Amino acid sequence: MVAFTIRRLFEAAIVMLTVALLAFVLFRFVGDPVNQMVGQDTSLEDRLRLRQELGLNDPVAVQFARFVADAARFDFGISYQMKQPVTAIISERAPATIELALVAALFAVGLGIPMGVYTGIHRESWLSKVFLSVSLIGVSLPTFLIGIFLIYVFAVKLGVLPSFGRGEVVRLGFWNTGLLTASGLKALILPAITLGLFQMTLVTRLVRAEMLEVLRTDYIKFARARGLTWRAINFGHALKNTLVPVITVIGLQLGAVIAFAIITETVFQWPGMGLMFIQAVQNADIPVMAAYLLLVAFLFVLINFLVDLIYVRVDPRIRIYGRGV
């Protein structure tokens, strides 16, 4: 287990260094940072002094080492557009994205697993066909179209839910949350459904496929021959073995939910990191773009690492393999 953990940490460090190199190239070579920070009437002397202060005259290797060291301390410089530390901007926007992603993930898992189990056990029932139809729609339609449709129905026609914004938020130390207010909860419903629907359909179809495969195995037939109850067979044996690959997919999809919340946040004008990234692209705010890239990569690596640890606990074969290599 220790060797497995060390190997995964080493692989995670390699991934982060690679992403840091890409972010540095974006930061260093996509336009001149000085031109982004000063106006056209700035004198040449001031420009040269600013380049010296920013360390842009240093060798590229020195600049990259400094960039990695600063990123390790969560210091991403100053935003060109907002003239504020990028870390402060991300700290202000991150709670909105994290809450949206977690609620969307709970929606996807909370509905996807039961629907997948039901459609796997009751293949010919009418409700199973309804669930499969919903999953097909969720996979087929693009996220922005789902969001626009939900806004049209529930905000424009029915007027029961807000179409944009986060609602009222409450400050809890460094964290601002909308989960403790009625308007915040109402504002979260449509974006969470929009973001989580595609993930829910993936979980549903994966659980169904795994259930169908497991129910055909010999040990399930043996369990039936022993006279075990329907509940013990389907939930004690079949579902338990189904969840091994599902855990991996759910973990990776949680990272995808955070990374690809950009579209949902843009449609609903949700004040999170995704909308921040879009605004940074529009304004060529390179420090914010580089910080977002590094942060998303870090979240992917962290989630993948935690999933690997859970996977080792769930599936003993991984531990055996790890000792053999």
Which positions does each model-derived feature cover?
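Alpha-helical transmembrane segments of integral membrane proteins
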Residues: 2-4, 16, 94-127, 175-325
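Residue-level signal for discrete positions within transmembrane alpha-helices
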Residues: 12, 93, 97, 133-140, ...
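Membrane-embedded alpha-helical segments of multi-pass transporters/permeases
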Residues: 16, 20, 24-28, 144, ...
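Short hydrophobic, aromatic-rich alpha-helical segments embedded in or entering the lipid bilayer
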Residues: 44-74, 220, 269-280
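Membrane-interfacial helix-loop-helix junctions in multi-pass membrane proteins
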Residues: 52-60, 77-86, 168-188, 281-287
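An internal, D/E-rich "acidic patch" concept
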Residues: 57-113
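Membrane-water interface segments at transmembrane-helix boundaries in multipass membrane proteins
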Residues: 133-141, 145-200
